[in-house]
């Protein structure tokens, strides 16, 4: 297959990875990694070694683990109960149907409602644990975004500069 077609497919996968950082239906950083892997395997334009793919893969795995662990851990660290954690998860799922703002505020609102309605916490404590959920979301989203930017940068560097 022609390198330009492979490069186009790789670029589309990487761009879909960026979309996946915001849209929960798409696996963001893993899609970008697949784009880089396709580029490495099938394009004659690729000059970086397998160690780059392996390191990127390790960061994708770390990011995937953080996506599930960090929001829950920070919700608990900020005083959240299991109701806040479950509310955050449900808020994330509900927020999926109202992109992109729903994905951003869904976990926060879910954690807040979980704490208020089921844990019977006052507004200040509920807001604190919901804030923990929101901070976890921001950190993991930022990590995935930076990872996708690095992978995109590698791709662009190899095609246009190298």
Q: What feature does the model see in each segment?
A:
Residues 12-18, 36, 87-95, 132-133, ...:
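Hydrophobic, membrane-inserted alpha-helices
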Residues 1-5, 41-90, 116-141:
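Membrane-interfacial helix-loop-helix
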Residues 31-48, 90-98, 109-118:
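Interfacial segments of multi-pass membrane proteins
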Residues 6-13, 56, 147:
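Hydrophobic alpha-helical transmembrane segments of polytopic
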Residues 14-31, 91-101:
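Transmembrane alpha-helix interface/packing and boundary motifs in multi-pass membrane proteins
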Residues 149-162:
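Juxtamembrane boundary at the C-terminal end of a transmembrane helix
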Residues 20, 93-104, 140-151:
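Hydrophobic alpha-helical transmembrane segments in multi-pass membrane proteins
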Residues 34, 70-71, 109, 152:
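Hydrophobic/aromatic residues in alpha-helical transmembrane segments
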């Amino acid at each position: 297959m022609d390198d330009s077609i492979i490069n186009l497919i790789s670029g589309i996968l990487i761009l879909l990875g960026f979309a996946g950082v915001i849209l929960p239906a798409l696996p963001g950083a893993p899609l970008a990694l697949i784009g880089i892997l396709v580029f490495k395997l099938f394009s004659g334009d690729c000059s970086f070694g397998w160690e780059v793919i392996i390191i990127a893969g390790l960061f994708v795995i770390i990011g995937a683990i953080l996506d599930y662990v960090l929001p829950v851990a920070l919700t608990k660290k900020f005083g959240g109960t299991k109701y806040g954690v479950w509310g955050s998860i449900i808020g994330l799922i509900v927020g999926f149907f109202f992109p992109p703002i729903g994905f951003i505020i869904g976990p926060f609102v879910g954690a807040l409602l979980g704490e208020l309605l089921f844990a019977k916490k006052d507004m200040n404590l509920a807001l604190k644990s919901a804030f923990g959920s929101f901070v976890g979301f921001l950190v993991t989203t930022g990590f995935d975004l930076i990872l996708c930017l690095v992978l995109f940068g590698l791709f662009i560097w190899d095609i246009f500069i190298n």
